[in-house]
Design a protein with these regions (language model features):
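Membrane-proximal interfacial segments on either side of biological membranes
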Residues: 1-352
Length: 352
């Protein structure tokens, strides 16, 4: 029978459902069993109104979800979940909770997903999460923790991704020659933000001397002032520097990392890439980026670079493309040098 007019949700004729709800004093209980051909779903749960203690156990075995959602691409599902705890105020140090879940089998379209486990806990206002996946689409482990009794974001995240199968996920036309893998760590405290990403010979580091909320507020304020100054056709570099967040980013990459492998599958390659930028009210915006040995089809560019330096009166920019004597196509040097001052700008093009 259709539940919604478009037939996207239905109740199969072969379904049998038994449910029991009870209450004795302050103890509430519920049990449910669903049978649909070979599929079985069992739920057992309880909650105490006085102590706020609860538990819930859910087991699903070979349930054909497609029989309930015929317009979706979800088919067989086998999974388990259990939850146990006391208290419902997540900000209270007295609240405790534990959650365990596992996905043994999920058929979604042409994908078969299995080997996924999640564990979460809450104790003394500290929430923890552990996630693991071991299947042909994704092999990874992740850990995270966060304090819930802070007025700011206070937590950490660690990810170890051994392989993401981009070909089976339909993101690239053919299998990559090397695994798409990386490790990532992030940390937010009362006075700093840190991010690191390592993948082969690709290394990214980011750090800010503030909370995430303050960083977002400073960034929004900077964009707002800059937009207003652009509309008024007059830049005040000193005013812009005063609202800059204190942050820095450094990125280095060779040609042995997931990004280079992904680009290679698209017919793009390079020798190395470097980027380094810093932002502080004291020194303004300063940075440099460069790509060496960029190749796209028959085009080869030896060096592409860009630098920026700001003081209280101007922002100096320089960029260019250089092909050296050993370039198989043509040798040249093209540079752009400019200044963006408070009320005007200048740009010089040089081609040799």
């Amino acid at each position: 029978a259709d539940i919604v007019p478009d037939g996207s949700i239905i109740v199969p004729d072969s379904m049998h459902l038994a449910a029991r709800v009870g209450m004795e004093g302050t103890q509430c209980t519920a049990a449910l069993k669903l049978l649909e051909k070979e599929g079985v779903l069992n739920l057992d749960a309880a909650y105490n109104l006085a102590t706020e203690a609860y538990h819930a156990d859910l087991a699903i075995n070979n349930l054909q979800v497609h029989h309930f959602l015929p317009k979706d691409s979800i088919y067989t599902l086998t999974a388990k979940m259990s939850a146990k705890g006391q208290g419902v105020d997540v900000a209270s140090r007295k609240t405790v909770a534990a959650l365990n879940a596992s996905l043994e089998k999920l058929q979604y379209g042409h994908w078969d997903i299995s080997g996924v486990e999640a564990h979460a806990g809450l104790k003394s206002s500290v929430a923890t999460v552990r996630l693991a996946s071991d299947n042909v689409l994704l092999k990874m482990q992740g850990n995270a923790d966060m304090r819930l009794d802070r007025s700011y974001l206070d937590g950490a995240l660690d990810l170890n991704v051994e392989e993401v199968n981009l070909h089976k996920l339909g993101l690239v036309p053919r299998p990559l020659k090397h695994p798409f893998a990386f490790t990532m760590g992030a940390e937010a405290r009362h006075d700093s933000l840190k991010l690191r990403l390592d993948a082969g010979d690709l290394n990214l580091r980011f750090r800010a001397h503030s909370t995430l909320k303050k960083l977002m507020e400073q960034s929004d304020k900077f964009v707002s002032i800059l937009t207003k100054q652009i509309d008024e056709r007059r830049l005040d570099h000193a005013a812009l520097r005063q609202v800059l967040p204190s942050a820095g980013m450094h990125l280095e990459a060779g040609n042995q990392n997931p990004v280079s492998y992904f680009l290679a599958a698209k017919g793009i390659s390079y020798n190395d890439f470097k980027l380094s930028f810093g932002f502080t009210p004291q020194v303004g915006i300063n940075g440099r980026t460069a790509v060496h040995g960029l190749r796209m089809d028959s085009l080869q560019l030896d060096t592409i670079f860009f630098t920026v330096k700001q003081d209280t009166a101007r922002m100096k920019l320089q960029g260019g493309v250089i092909n050296g004597p050993k370039n198989p196509q043509f040798v040249f040097r093209s540079t752009l040098t400019g200044e963006v001052r408070n009320e005007d700008a200048e740009l010089t093009v040089d081609y040799v």
